[in-house]
Amino acid sequence: MKPGIHPNYRTVVFHDTSADTYFTVGSTIATARTIERDGQTYPYVTLDISSASHPYYTGKQKEFSKEGSAARFHQRYGSFLTKKAS
């Protein structure tokens, strides 16, 4: 293989700051920050959102009604459509 063209694959600690959760996974991301975990020093990356805090994965997402967009439109603006011009 050609030297110097491959990314540096290593174990990295990702920190989801909104859920205060740490993930230790393999990655090629470049960072200058480090963290000490389990007696070893790892590269450290902070995240705003991950599967630990995203509403889709946590089940805390807003659920829309089963009616559909046309029914919601008529519910909001139906009174304007049924008014007769005077």
UniProtKB/Swiss-Prot annotation:
**Record GO terms (molecular function):** structural constituent of ribosome
| Keyword Ribonucleoprotein among record annotations | yes
Q: Which Pfam families match?
A: Ribosomal_L31 (PF01197)
Domain of life from the UniProt record = Bacteria
One GO BP annotation is:
translation
GO CC terms on record?
Answer: ribonucleoprotein complex; ribosome
Hey, which family's this protein in? Belongs to the bacterial ribosomal protein bL31 family. Type B subfamily.
| The protein's assembly and partners | Part of the 50S ribosomal subunit.
Protein name, as recorded: Large ribosomal subunit protein bL31B
